[in-house]
Amino acid sequence: MPCLTLETLIKIPSSLLALSRIGTLAQWDASLDMSLARRPMLHSAGLKSMEQLLYCDLWNQLNTMQKIILPMHDGGRGYDIIMTTSLSSDVPVGYFSWSEYDIMAPVQQKTEKALAAAFISNCGARNFRLQALEGLEKSGITIDSYGGCHRNRDGRVDKVEALKHYRFSLAFENSNEEDYVTEKFFQSLVAGTVPVVVGAPNIEDFAPSPGSVLHIKEIDDIAVVAKKMNFLAENPDAYNQSLRWKYEGPSDSFKALVDMAAVHSSCRLCILLATRIRENEEKSVESEKRPCKCSQGSETIYHVYVRERGTFEMESIFLRSSNLTLEALKSAVLKKFDYLRHVPIWKPERPESIRGNNLRVYKIYPLGLTQRQALYSFTFPGPREFRSHIEANPCSKFEVIFV
């Protein structure tokens, strides 16, 4: 995709933007020339209160936007809010959503003679995807190629409709970056074909179930993956296991990931900004403060706040010192949100077949974590650590992910 700047159409008091440069979302393709990527992009559209400046001085031809943006974020280089495909950014902007992709569409018969289909038009990608395609062919995998690279089929077809009739789809990205998972992968899921991936090293985080994706991590994996493809093609029961999620539903992990996109990234940006503004207001001496704990006999009652991911308003939860555990918090959250007859924010977006009827807690985590931390790495090791967190953070704030 081309080098692009997008204006963030949100008015924010200038006093909150002192020494900050936010409002510019930049996206690059890994095939951009160094000279183009290094060019500063200065944009002002009547925004008197702030300068929108993005200078890509860290560009390397082997790196994509994540490698440019995140070091600036981590190193305190002046960007207050980062929006990229990375789940480690402040506001992730992924390619996935329930509304854009009919992920639970039924599986069709595999009628094509070739085992796999490929749609690759950028023949100058910075990874080894063309070598992978050639390596699979040398290993005996028959491939119908509809794109501009290695074309042997007429490319004037509906991509998803064509993919439905192949056992495998070559979901080969143009760069191998964490969380950079594009429509190539999600269209494969819609089509009910098994994705063979060259791309994100953590593609398993995006898999709808264990064993549903084949991953070529490096060139040496090509022969092994080709052998697996042939095995699955010759053993229908084993192949059908790879698509079992289409009939029984994807994992909670997958649902929790895609549910994030039920709230548009621009709305999640607003929630982030509003949360920061509120936190600054709460630190003010003039703000009315509710007590964070009180005594009741020999017990201490702790007041904490919880909101569903993708929403702004908090709900009050009270925990007793005699049962100050994560499980107690989960139980209290379910009780409170059931009482409120809460409808999960993702419910209108999810396919009806996998919505479920009862609230279930997937994750509860301290407010302020990235989605990578919240979904995949953060945990309270035990009751002691949870208690320490509550005691060290008066009126602790949490987010909950329902599935």
Task: Label the predicted regions.
Residues 1-32, 36-50, 56-58, 62, ...:
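Pol beta-like nucleotidyltransferase catalytic core
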